[in-house]
Amino acid sequence: MPYETELISENECKSFRDRYDEEGLFSAKADINGIIVQLFTSDRDHIDMWRDNFYAASDRVRAHARLYCITDKEEPESKLYFEPATCTAFLFNFDYYGWVKSIALGIAGYILEGTHDTYSVHGAAIDVDDVGVTLIAPSKTGKTTQSW
């Protein structure tokens, strides 16, 4: 895994949320198979790609999950903290957007598995002359490049 992941408690989650106020961050909600995931980030490129990659969700609908993509020199390089009860993730120092997208899809999958017995894979699908091919591989291996 190119980044370290750590589970945190609800109190630690609240502490992070208090420290990294949502004001001044770009925010957008995405509808991922009916799961609403909200991204908060200071990176305009990340928010633009988020809006390009996912269907927009209404701001009037409460998010099932939240991702805070934060740049902070005091935090370790590319570290993910996840609080499972509220499905809140803090992504520190992630410059590669593909990981942000992958984590959002993973959290949506986590919710869908628990509530609907729906299981997902990380891949790309290609249809050529009515013949389908699926590429399944980890992030940053070129699935999109090969299937675009």
Each model region followed by its residue ranges:
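A noncatalytic interaction/capping subdomain that flanks phosphate/NTP-handling catalytic cores
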Residues: 1-132
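Glycine-rich phosphate-binding P-loop
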Residues: 128-148
